[in-house]
Amino acid sequence: MAASRSLVPDRLRLPLCFLGVFVCYFYYGILQEKITRGKYGEGPKQETFTFALTLVFIQCVINAMFAKILIQFFDTARVDRTRTWLYAACSVSYVGAMVSSNSALQFVNYPTQVLGKSCKPIPVMLLGVTLLKKKYPLAKYLCVLLIVAGVALFMYKPKKVVGIEEHTVGFGELLLLMSLTLDGLTGVSQDHMRAHYQTGSNHMMLNINLWSTFLLGAGILFTGELWEFLSFAERYPTIIYNILLFGLTSALGQSFIFMTVVYFGPLTCSIITTTRKFFTILASVILFANPISSMQWVGTVLVFLGLGLDAKFGKGTKKTSH
């Protein structure tokens, strides 16, 4: 994306980043729900999509190809000295987080998944304190407390609400918790790479997705999921089109996020992605008839308020002295 300085005027760069992130991940979210929660076929023989490993495999292949193109045209001067084993280790948590997140959609609705994934500051802070010995400002803890309160309100259902799936905290929520924890580990690994090897975003995107492709490729062959998916795709060929678009919007969205961080910093990027997630929940409610109670809306607002305040006031960290 280095070439974008000459290709895009300064005054248009922020609107381009905002629209790029918003449109790509907005459509990504719609496709994700359509693929994973849609019904295929007619009548009593309707089927659901259960091929989480294959979905993430295709996504990683497209991400790796896209990163390779970016390096080839815009990032040829950078020499990557990051240790190979670090990429391999990071890819394990990266794959686990994405597979868990997609698998969770078989058990929880999309607003719950988006809200759950929005709680990333919680494991990041916990892992930062325990593994990296970081100290955070009071504002950070208050923001995380606000997020926790919002999630608690969203998950609490005192009585049955018409049209809302009634369930206790179960396997879907555990998958989201696992995804969040693995996201935190991925973030710690990526911070280590940047701090010790000055790893570029495009090289990181390429190598982590390449290793993830190898892991997932072995997984879908070993479990036989690949052949089941191909049979499913033969019965419902439109799924291929949706999955390819899903992977493409993911890769484009990542590139716009990196561009936003480079030119405007993590604060602006955090505000844009937080806004996008809120409107993705709204779209899911409207387009896919995922009703949300008034208490859940209050919880949703609290979560995004906590995320917004965290982006503004909770970024200061310092390492403890040893």
UniProtKB/Swiss-Prot annotation:
Transmembrane spans: 12-32, 51-71, 85-105, 136-156, 168-188, 210-230, 243-263, 285-305
InterPro entries: SCL35B1-4/HUT1
Tree of life domain: Eukaryota
This protein's UniProt keywords: Antiport, Endoplasmic reticulum, Membrane, Transmembrane, Transmembrane helix, Transport
Main location: endoplasmic reticulum
Motif (Di-lysine motif): 318-322
Topology versus the membrane: Multi-pass membrane protein
Signal peptide: none
Any one GO CC term of the record: endoplasmic reticulum membrane
A GO molecular-function annotation: ATP:ADP antiporter activity
Compartments in which it is found: Endoplasmic reticulum membrane
Catalytic activity: ADP(in) + ATP(out) = ADP(out) + ATP(in); UDP(out) + ATP(in) = UDP(in) + ATP(out); UTP(out) + ATP(in) = UTP(in) + ATP(out); dATP(out) + ATP(in) = dATP(in) + ATP(out)
Domain note: The di-lysine motif confers endoplasmic reticulum localization for type I membrane proteins.
Function recorded in the entry: ATP:ADP antiporter that catalyzes the exchange of ATP and ADP across the endoplasmic reticulum (ER) membrane. Imports ATP from the cytosol to the ER lumen and exports ADP in the opposite direction. Regulates ER energy metabolism and protein biogenesis. Appears to be part of a calcium-dependent ER to cytosol low energy response axis, where calcium efflux from ER to the cytosol triggers ATP import into the ER lumen to maintain sufficient ATP supply. Provides ATP to ER chaperone HSPA5 that drives protein folding and trafficking in the ER.
Sequence similarity: Belongs to the nucleotide-sugar transporter family. SLC35B subfamily.
Protein name: Solute carrier family 35 member B1
Species whose genome carries this gene: Mus musculus
